[in-house]
Every structure is written in C-alpha cells, then in structure tokens.
Amino acid sequence: MLQPKRTKFRKQMTGHNRGLAHRGSKVSFGEYALKATGRGRLTARQIESARRALTRHVKRGGKIWIRVFPDKPVTKKPLEVRMGKGKGGVEYWVAQIQPGKVLYEIEGVSEELAREAFALAAAKLPLATSFVKRTVM
C-alpha cells in the first residue's frame, strides 16, 4: 500500500477539494493516460487495485506510471466511542483528486490494449475518468 514514510504532522484537517488540477494535468511519461474528469478522493487501496487491474491486463508488455500518491491521512474514531476525547487515529491515506489530473500513464502497448486496460482500471475507481493520448507539439 502507498503511504508516506514520514510526515511532519500525524494528522491533517479535512480541508476542501476545490478548483482544477493544473499541475500533473499533462501526459508526461507514457503514450496514453487515464485522466480524472471528476473530483474526489482516492484511497491507497483503490490506487493499488486499479494498478493491479492495469498490470494484469497488459501482462509483460508496456510500462506503467502511477501519477498520484496518497499523502493525506484520514482519521476515524473506533466504533461505539462517545464524542470528545480528541481526534481519532489515522485509518487510511488518500490522494485528493481535482478534474484534469492524470492518474495513470502507459507506453509500449497498442492503443486498443491501453483503452481496454484503462477501462478495467477505471471500474475500480470512484471517479469519472477519460482516456487521453500524448499530444506532440
């Protein structure tokens, strides 16, 4: 599972997920990419599940890049605990996703295979996504 090795603070405020992704919105490494068109949070488990779907479909061919990293801790209090007594412990890690963010990239495979692989990966994610190609300038 992806998570930071160490952080300055153990817990973070919830915050707001507003605006569009400007950083990480272009296809930088591979030929084809899966881009988020909706906003939300991706957990480390969801990122890993989609990565597995991608690698299993592509098999030995191609190289895959994961362009998102879960760096925000989400806390939760245990079940049947009364309110108060401070914030709960860190339960899992999430990556906040804005529309336009590139999630995964792939190269070394045909466009048809890339589309199929990204369709399988997108089914594992709670966001609306789209398939994009690298534009050559």
From Swiss-Prot:
Pfam families: Ribosomal_L16
BP-aspect Gene Ontology terms: translation
InterPro entries: Ribosomal_uL16, Ribosomal_uL16_bact-type, Ribosomal_uL16_CS, Ribosomal_uL16_dom, Ribosomal_uL16_sf
GO molecular function, a single term: rRNA binding
Keyword Ribosomal protein tagged: yes
GO CC annotations on file: cytosolic large ribosomal subunit
Keyword Protease appears in the UniProt entry: no
Superkingdom of source: Bacteria
UniProt keyword annotations, A-Z: Ribonucleoprotein, Ribosomal protein, RNA-binding, rRNA-binding, tRNA-binding
PROSITE patterns: RIBOSOMAL_L16_1, RIBOSOMAL_L16_2
Gene3D superfamilies membership: Ribosomal protein L10e/L16
Its biological purpose: Binds 23S rRNA and is also seen to make contacts with the A and possibly P site tRNAs.
Subunit structure: Part of the 50S ribosomal subunit.
Family label: Belongs to the universal ribosomal protein uL16 family.
Protein's UniProt name: Large ribosomal subunit protein uL16
Biological source species: Pseudomonas paraeruginosa (strain DSM 24068 / PA7) (Pseudomonas aeruginosa (strain PA7))
Name of the coding gene: rplP
